[in-house]
């Protein structure tokens, strides 16, 4: 009878743990969807961007680019990034077709070679043009491409945030997981910790200066990617 009681207790305890886990997963997904909705609905947009690369000695290199975005709700958003300066990267272009399921598609145009190169899914993880951003970072982060788990509540720079974990479903992703801080008030993403294939926290992405355009669409004025 004691063995039966212990076994029954263990089963109930196991079911309780699974129930909590499922609840946290659903809550994490719900928060991710709210953050995605705050970005969605724009249709298409054009943006002028400036990238500042800072090395360990403090020297700064400036790059100027343009980005065109096209929203495709039934599949995944598309983007075209074209570098305008400095001279050594002028004309370099990245075309990204994100997909809600399956691998994203990316093409790289190199003016020196005068040809377009399709980027293999497993080759999108390294630093792009000497920056801390990878080609994977430059593609849209569709909600469906991750599994989620709610972790905790936490204050980040005086903002009350929900902290969630998302795990890429793409087997070729350069990340094993990402820890994401989403403001409770907005809800907007303010920070992401990126973990590499060895589960080491090697990059932190920070979003600052959110501005609302057309009284509807929130966009950060600055995105910092810090390599640890």
Name what the model sees in each region.
Residues 68-70, 149-155, 208-210:
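Short amphipathic beta-strand and strand-loop transition segments with alternating hydrophobic
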Residues 140-147, 153:
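Surface-exposed beta-loop interaction hotspot
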